[in-house]
Amino acid sequence: MFIFRLASTALAGLAVFCGAAVGSAADSAADRPASATSAVAAGEWVAFGRDPGGSQHSPLAQIDARNVSKLRRAWVHRSGDYVDAPQPRGTSLQTTPLHVNGMLYFCTPMNRVFALDPVTGRERWVFDPHRTDAKSGRPALSPPLANPTRCRGVAYWQSKAPSAARAASASAAAGARATDNGAAAVCQRRIFKNGDNTRVYALDADTGLPCSDFGAAKGHKGWVSHADYENHGDGNFGTSTSPPAVLGDVVIAAMSANDGLANAKNGMVRAFDVRSGELRWEFDPIPPQYRDQSGAANVWSTISVDVEHNLVFLPTTSPSTDYYGGGRRFEMPLVNAIVALDGTSGKVVWSQQVVRHDLFDYDLVGHPLLVDIVRDGRKVQAALLQTKMGWLYGFERTTGKPLWPIVERPVPMSDVPGEQAAPTQPVPQGMAPFAHQTLTRDQLFGITPIDRLACRRKFDELRYDGMYTPPSVRGSILFPSALGGGNWGGAAYDPASNLLIIKAENLATVLKVIPKADAADDKVPPKDYLTRPLVGTPYRIEGELFQSPLGVPCTPPPWGTLMALDLATGKARWEIPLGQIKRAGITVPKGAGWGSPNVGGPITTAGGLTFIGATMDSRFRAIDTRTGKELWSAELPVPGMAVPMSYAVNGKQYVLIAAGGNAMVGTPIGDYLIAYALPD
């Protein structure tokens, strides 16, 4: 999560958002996710990344390079769930719908869940956990949501042999608007959603009614709560913006946390029985002996699962606080790590930490892509991990063995009293970085000689010793910054070409550590994500984008890129600027090659195409996966800052994206779900 500004006259303000077993049970063969007992049907999209492993690849090929120019809008749905206002009240539609059970399922920033007809976009049912305002028909949020801005998706489970009762229940509930006061009797197909209030909801996928057996042991009707269990640390619970994951008969749900509080609540990951809601296991990235000294390490991003090997893959974040770790100078090997858990017990099978003693907010930002790649002439079951640093790590899925070497590289030390930076960081070898990682004085950018000179003067005043330069009292340049490099949803695999398509941002931030005058400094409210009191530490942090007086980034463009990495050779096959800056009706010409800061990510299809929105210019693009050539684009009402998806009904392929803008980026805001298809 981050806020920055990028603008002035032609480039106005911009901000980018980037989030011990207690019991066990054997996997029930009768109750598994649809993809656990068979491959995902070609026309379905059953998890955030299409399949449980999160490949972000569709095997559909009806739309291809020859006909993509003919794509047209098939339908548009508007939920009404948006607030066109600045942060913190403005919304950001980041959802990726599922297509399964003959419906499209998605969530909104106001916590509602919709089921749509995939051919027409008409509503089948709506679940609203809030009471509804009588005048507007919209959720009446009282009290207002703590973070009413993001919901990236929902999860799906079904019994292996659902009964014929579905047809009757679905027919009776067509067009129904469910609330958390209803109850569904059957629930042999379930939609799971993380709520804003520590809850995990279970809904009947046919009707939208809550599954009354889920959470019944705790006295709930259709939901469970993390608050019902032991939680270490201080402060409020964080919200969860990403969907749960389903593996066998458990649903795995995580929480975010307050990383500006030294002993924040720990970011627990819990697995619940899909039917009863009973706790199966829980996982805490913080070692037990340190649970009351540090907190916040969590999994705010998406989770992937390996059905074949019964593994859950977690991308964990930094512990609290961001930017200063003087109070947590002890070993925590499961933070800033890819962690593979046994799906039945929740015990760690293997882990690999990729950031040591994080002082940079280098959270792991996206689910590991669990895909079969070609490397060294053989097919390998891989777990691919993109990072904010612009590094791509690859591991053998069942053992954690690196697929390309990782070496410990010496990095700059901290000069902040009380701090001690890690002496080395693990750097992969043999795989090209997908983002810019170095910055020199001569590279600094400016629209005019005057603002370029201003960037150079600022550069001379600040500390910059290359990558992993820690924050300092003097002020340090962090590049890549916590904006990325990579970020959530940012990578998609194409099995036909063995290419990983991955987007990046190339922006730097300035971070200054300031000693607190007294305890009252802890009570100063945060200005934004980069300027905060760091409660419980002797310092506060002030941060901003590294930019000129004109509000233009000092880092050289392109500020947003899309790259194809050849996983066999480790080299970039192609790289292009992604999108254009657009603000106040002005779009920077494509030929400038500046690219655009971006939120969201790509998908690939068997038609040889990469589809991506994500950019400030409100365009939805189709790129030739093998060459990087743009083949088609369509203008969206507002930016599509989400991961798109593709599905098929009756032999017809659709490509869909959520276009809702992003309040943290300062774009226009909306509530559009737009499907495209070839004309009949």
Show the residue positions of the predicted features.
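Long, low-complexity segments enriched in small/aliphatic residues
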Residues: 429-509, 517-518, 561-564
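N-terminal secretory signal peptides that target proteins for export/translocation
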Residues: 1-4
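Short, solvent-exposed loop/turn elements at domain surfaces
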Residues: 46, 52-59, 82-87, 114, ...
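Acidic, proline/glycine-rich low-complexity intrinsically disordered segments
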Residues: 45, 52-53, 75, 79-81, ...
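N-terminal pre-domain segments of enzymes
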Residues: 25-62, 171, 423-452, 527
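Extracytoplasmic/lumenal domain signature
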Residues: 66-82, 113-146, 156-173, 200-235, ...
